[in-house]
Amino acid sequence: MLEPGRSRGAEDTAFRKLIDSYCEAWSTGTADAPAKFYAKDNGLVFYDVAPFAYHGWKELHDGVQKEFLDNASEIKLTAGRDLKVTGRGMIARTIVPMHLMERSKNGKTTEMDLRYTGIWEKRGASWVLVHDHLSAPLAGS
């Protein structure tokens, strides 16, 4: 639980580990690995680079696997050092720049800087994503 006015050191350290584990899970190349980070409720929306939105975990899982991960021979998602954590009680928001390296099965390598915002809810002993938003800045910005 995030408590207002309390030292944030422990929470920031915990969320740093959580975000790094989240990136490691997506870097496995299968959408099954990061499943533990996502709430499975109906009606949740997750924004991605493409397509615009996924409605629920199943749609996110299947869409990212088919459109992105199945075409990759290697994926590496890395969170930047500038992690911001804010929240109160059972809800937290994380904001962090990320870097993605993707090597396609045809050998082409693509790298991009990304912006990431996650909305987390504490459920039992775990924090799970109830919304996230991944975006890429326009070229030249």
Per-segment meaning from a language model:
Residues M1-K40, G140-S141:
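Short, low-complexity N-terminal intrinsically disordered segments enriched in polar/charged residues
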Residues T13, L18, A31-G87, E111:
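A solvent-exposed, acidic/Ser-Thr-rich amphipathic alpha-helical stretch
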Residues S27, M98-S104, W120:
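Beta-strand elements of well-folded, non-transmembrane domains
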Residues Y38, M98-L100, H133-A136:
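Short beta-strand segments enriched in hydrophobic/aromatic residues
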Residues Y54-H55, M101-S104, P137-S141:
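A short local loop/turn or secondary-structure capping micro-motif enriched for an aromatic residue
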Residues L77, G89-L100, L114:
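A short hydrophobic beta-strand element
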Residues R93, M112-G140:
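Short beta-strand edge/turn micro-motifs at domain boundaries
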Residues K105-T109:
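Short, solvent-exposed loop/turn segments at secondary-structure boundaries
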